[in-house]
Regions:
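Extracellular/periplasmic, surface-exposed regions of secreted and cell-surface proteins
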Residues: 2-59, 68-311
Length: 311
């Protein structure tokens, strides 16, 4: 059952420990645009990402190693729906002032479910069904739902194709956080000066482009698992031979968004039609960092997710 290097023989694994996997995946999106007046574009779109994964593993009884005579089945079902609605209006004034105004809303709904079961001590290769084992492990069954909502708007302005200003604001909400902290506001602003188009640089033939840029903004991070903010209980436990439930995770009513503030100042240029140079300075500060925080073992828990620090 081993080759000369001490590894499992692939033929042995295929014949005596077969593992069958199958996945059905769906990705798709639809959208609808209308232009009721000149410069106004209204768009609605829907997207779906879904899959159904199944795995069947068997270790036939005639295998030479401990753990033979085992069958396991598992599946995972996941889907995520994204709904986006935007309205964008572009217009100009006096031929030099150009505006783009956008307002939008987005919702993302995600659901996931996992299930697995294992049956042991099977004695007949012809009866490798889950009900044929003399012993079975406690099945694993998990599921979660999460929802993300956002309202956002942007304004872009340019004058004479040389001065540019961008403003953006958004309000994001996530079901992952505590009830009173699910919503947070974020914003950004930026400006760019195309100096090459100024009159005092028109006669500099070797200078192809020269741009000065500055931006400042905030963003949020909600990268935690579902229900980290809630105090949960678990079942399937025995105490003095009797089934019961017990606390499984520590809740945190103060859990909120991690936020990042970023300042960026840069200059870019191109000379002699071949050499490009770009210099940037940035400063980034992260507040309310989401991390696992160790707890005293006297609490009965190892850690909890908290907003622990700034960096």
């Amino acid at each position: 059952y081993f080759d000369d290097m001490g590894y499992y023989n692939p033929y042995y694994l295929a014949e005596l420990q077969p593992n069958d996997r199958s996945t059905v995946r769906i990705n798709g999106n639809t959208f609808f645009n209308i232009n009721p007046i000149k410069g106004l574009n209204i768009r609605t779109s829907q997207a779906v990402d879904a899959f159904d994964y199944r795995n069947s593993h068997k270790a036939y009884p005639e295998g030479p190693f401990e753990g033979a005579g085992v069958a396991s089945e598992s599946f995972e079902r996941y889907y995520s729906f994204t709904f986006t609605n935007t309205a964008e209006y572009k217009f100009s004034l006096s031929g030099k002032h150009h505006f783009t105004v956008l307002a939008g809303q987005e919702s993302i709904i995600t659901k996931n479910e996992n299930f697995s079961a294992t049956s042991k001590k099977m004695v007949d290769t012809r009866m490798m069904l889950m009900a044929a084992g003399a012993e079975s492990e406690v099945p694993l069954h998990t599921m979660y739902d999460k929802v993300f909502n956002s309202y956002f708007g942007t304004i872009s302005y340019s004058f004479a194709d040389r001065y540019y200003i961008d403003l953006a604001a958004r309000r994001d909400g996530s079901s992952l956080f505590a009830k009173n902290n699910q919503w947070a506001n974020f914003y950004s602003m930026g400006a760019m000066w195309d100096m090459r188009k100024e009159n005092f640089l028109q006669d500099v033939s070797w200078l192809n482009s020269l741009q000065l840029k500055v931006s400042y903004g905030t963003t949020g991070n909600s990268g935690i698992s579902a229900y980290n903010a809630l105090a949960l209980v678990g079942s399937g436990l025995l105490y003095n031979g009797q089934p019961g439930i017990a606390p499984s995770t520590v809740g945190n009513d103060n859990l909120t968004w991690e936020s990042m503030k970023t300042l960026n100042i840069g200059i870019s240029t191109k000379v002699f039609d071949r050499f490009s140079v770009e210099l940037e300075f940035y400063n980034r500060q992260t507040d309310d960092m989401l991390m696992g925080y160790p707890l005293s073992y006297t609490t009965g828990h190892g850690s909890s997710v908290e907003n622990v620090a700034s960096m």
